[in-house]
Amino acid sequence: MRWPSVATLAGLRMGVRCDRSGTVAVDFQTAGGGRMNGLAYGVAKADGGLFPSVMSNRYFLQDASFLVGLSADDQRLLERLYGALASPVWQLYLGRKGYVPSVPPYLSDGLVHRDLVPALAGYPWADRADATVRVVLEETDPLGAEPRMDQPVDYERRRFGRRYVRIEMLSGPRTLLGGGARVSEPDTP
């Protein structure tokens, strides 16, 4: 089965509701520079030698909660994407390192037949959601929108193009139900 092109996927309209912003955390990492079974090992150099330990800081977002919606005229495409998230062939990760999502990246009741904004506004909010949440929507009209140079054009060559986004604030419920229950319906914009 052939998957959609980057251009087809770029044609989808995306919206993100940020229920919890989370916090930025740092993970200090090292690679190589040690010994295993008495033999030195590490990151190989072109001449066959070894680099000393490579140290780096990796930044990631912890304890955040987002609801992402996609909209398209092609319902079959949305169903294929939804099915791919529900039954992935490879392990899913967030970012360039294997940061695995703590919950499945799809909702069992997430494939809905509504416009994008009402669907994002009307879906129950996550536990501990902020009282007011940010909603980021892709726009085709640059008027009143902010440019972003992160629209994938070519994954192989890591080329990106411009897209436009609009940010709105959405007020929601101020009291949450305990015990992992979902919150009440939010106010719509």
Where would I find each of the regions flagged by the language model?
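Short, glycine-/polar-rich solvent-exposed loops and beta-turns at beta-strand/coil boundaries
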Residues: 5-10
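Internal, well-folded beta-alpha domain core
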Residues: 13, 17-189
